[in-house]
Amino acid sequence: MAGLAISPPLGLSFSSRTRNPKPTSFLSHNQRNPIRRIVSALQSPYGDSLKAGLSSNVSGSPIKIDNKAPRFGVIEAKKGNPPVMPSVMTPGGPLDLSSVLFRNRIIFIGQPINAQVAQRVISQLVTLASIDDKSDILMYLNCPGGSTYSVLAIYDCMSWIKPKVGTVAFGVAASQGALLLAGGEKGMRYAMPNTRVMIHQPQTGCGGHVEDVRRQVNEAIEARQKIDRMYAAFTGQPLEKVQQYTERDRFLSASEALEFGLIDGLLETEY
């Protein structure tokens, strides 16, 4: 059994066991293999920051600023480490963490998704697509769920824009957060090894007149059927198996999510 190392454009590399290894690109690799495992952490996406004139290092090296392009500098963190909040004032103003993430085409969702969160994420997706419709976007998820309508709005935007949107989960991707994780570009959906994924049928509350309650129940049933069909398309699993999994809260480890087809690979950490 030979080991195949792949270095994708997003800075991920993983190994796959196959009898006839063939080099392949990350973006064109859409077939899932439950044996795949990421063997290196996400590399820094800030490769062009030196060209912009602003660079930093998490070890505490002094920051260098080029006054010729002060407003477009980005942070260059040590490879394998996440962006670090810079304590620096630049000629273009204070540089905050959200700006660093946005300039490097990274979207972070770390809370339940409601209408306000969906508006922010959709605005970021559309803006990044209008700036550059050829470069990929990376979405980090530590999300316990949220509004079905809001999550479907984000997914529709992810599917509509031209850039490919990869997803990476850590912590928890539950309920509609799991739907977003699975709805990322096929071949670009990942999770940390300690991530917990939970899928289930949509939850709703009903109230009002009897006729109003009946209509709300019908809407919830329709939402469940739609989401089950989406999971079946995302995972390649039969619809009957998806319905069995979503009948009640189904908790999955990262490895089980990989086997089920919700993700395409695992990011490897020390433990």
Curated annotation (Swiss-Prot):
GO terms for biological process: proteolysis. Induction: Repressed in darkness. Induced during cold acclimation (at protein level). It is found in: Plastid, Chloroplast stroma. GO terms for molecular function: ATP-dependent peptidase activity; serine-type endopeptidase activity. Residues 1-30 are annotated as: Disordered. SUPFAM superfamilies: ClpP/crotonase. Mostly expressed in leaves. Also detected in stems, and to a lower extent, in roots (at protein level). Residues 13-30 have a biased composition (Polar residues). It holds the Pfam family CLP_protease. PROSITE patterns: CLP_PROTEASE_HIS. Keywords: Chloroplast, Hydrolase, Plastid, Protease, Serine protease, Transit peptide. InterPro entries: ClpP, ClpP/crotonase-like_dom_sf, ClpP/TepA, ClpP_His_AS. Its EC number is 3.4.21.92. CDD domains: S14_ClpP_2. GO terms for cellular component: chloroplast stroma. It comes from the Eukaryota. Belongs to the peptidase S14 family. Cleaves peptides in various proteins in a process that requires ATP hydrolysis. Has a chymotrypsin-like activity. Plays a major role in the degradation of misfolded proteins. Essential protein required for chloroplast development and integrity. Component of the chloroplastic Clp protease core complex which consist of at least 16 proteins: CLPP4 (3 copies), CLPP5 (3 copies), CLPR4 (2 copies), ClpP1 (1 copy), CLPP6 (1 copy), CLPR2 (1 copy), CLPT1 (1 copy), CLPT2 (1 copy) and 3 copies of CLPP3 and/or CLPR1 and/or CLPR3. The core complex is organized in two heptameric rings, one containing CLPP3,4,5,6 in a 1:2:3:1 ratio and the other CLPP1 and CLPR1,2,3,4 in a 3:1:1:1:1 ratio. This is ATP-dependent Clp protease proteolytic subunit 6, chloroplastic. The lineage of its organism: Eukaryota, Viridiplantae, Streptophyta, Embryophyta, Tracheophyta. The gene is CLPP6.
